[in-house]
Design a protein with these regions (language model features):
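Multi-pass alpha-helical transmembrane bundle typical of ion/small-solute transporters
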Residues: 1-339
Length: 339
């Protein structure tokens, strides 16, 4: 029951969202809202773990700012405004025209958004791959979950800019199999921008006087750099959910409500992990989340060439985090037996 207090707002928002879905389209719409909420939560649970790794180093003021402003940006910015902006750029349309298209011609809106999938995947995949590699390619990292893999990766930390090199190679390798020179160039440019944005976000922590922790993560003392890093991370995680939602419905209000409910639950999980000290108690949970991020980055790149069901994407993340949790429990039992 103690954990339930972290989900009070999420449960309340869920009730409001289901009622809103029912008013918009009856029971079928309410059901789609529920399915989208589950989809978003499953796709972004690893995001909650990574959020917690940053938030636990931030002061209370910036934690509250992230949880308040961050949820507004996550729901209205990433799940509503961002897709509209993408369609506006793709179709060279103004804001009013795009909103009109989304509300009154949702099929065309969905088609235009989906047409930019390769660029969205390149940007998000590159950003998430850098997050994944920065954690594991660190010669100072001494805690390993999958030691046969993670231990050799730490040695790559001696190679200057190894993360950037591997990410660029992944972008180029993925683009080599794409049809059409224009599409390949769009993918490469978007991927490079994902790389640039990550470097800027990570570098902001150093500029503002951050302290480097295990896994190479910069933790800004002021909290602002951490706030921006988390928002960019949330944006990268939201891409798959926004695109995948159109497989269920083309109604923008229904999509926004469903994904918004999911985003609220992700924030609630984040709160619980931070204030219950879960990451400290389960030493491999963080590793599982970063492996899930690496898997999501790979799926985004592979998804350019073939359709990968969103259920599989969410399932693989849940399996990795679940396995890391089980390994943590096993480690705790062994450690307590030795003490």
């Amino acid at each position: 029951m103690q954990n339930l207090k972290y989900f009070t707002w999420s449960i309340g928002f869920t009730v409001i969202g289901l009622v809103g879905g029912y008013l918009l389209g009856g029971w079928p719409a309410a059901f789609i809202v529920a399915v989208l909420a589950v989809l978003e939560t499953s796709l972004s649970f690893d995001n909650a773990v990574v959020n917690a790794t940053v938030l636990r180093h931030m002061d209370e003021k910036w934690r509250q700012r992230f949880l308040l402003w961050g949820i507004l940006i996550a729901v209205f910015g990433m799940r509503i405004v961002f897709p509209l902006a993408i369609v506006g750029v793709v179709a060279s349309m103004g804001p009013v025209e795009v909103v009109d298209l989304a509300l009154f011609n949702p099929d065309e809106y969905a088609r235009l958004l989906t047409s930019a999938h390769h660029e969205i995947a390149a940007f998000g995949g590159a950003f998430l791959m850098m997050v994944f590699l920065k954690f594991f390619i660190d010669e100072n990292k001494d805690t390993h979950w999958l030691a046969p893999i993670e231990s050799p990766l730490t040695k790559l930390g001696r190679l200057e800019a190894a993360q950037i090199l591997l990410t660029l190679l992944a972008i180029l390798a993925t683009s080599a199999w794409m049809d059409g020179a224009d599409k390949r160039m769009e993918f490469i440019v978007a991927g490079v921008w994902g790389l640039i944005v990550y470097i800027m976000a990570d570098g902001l922590g150093a500029i503002m006087g951050g302290e480097e922790g295990e896994g190479g993560r910069m933790v800004a003392k002021t909290g602002f750099a951490g706030f921006m890093y988390l928002e960019l991370l949330d944006a990268s995680f939201s891409f798959d959910g926004v695109i995948g939602a159109f497989a269920l419905t083309t109604s923008l209000p229904i999509i926004a409500i469903g994904l918004g409910v999911g985003a609220m639950f992700v924030r609630s999980f984040t709160l619980m992990l931070v204030y219950r000290g879960t990451l400290e108690a389960y030493r491999y949970l963080e590793h599982g989340a970063f492996w899930a991020i690496g898997a999501l980055a790979a799926i985004m790149f592979i998804g350019v060439h073939m359709h990968i069901p969103e259920t599989f994407t969410g399932l693989i993340g849940a399996v990795l985090i679940g396995a890391a949790f089980w390994s943590s429990l096993r480690h705790n039992r062994i450690a307590s037996g030795e003490s």
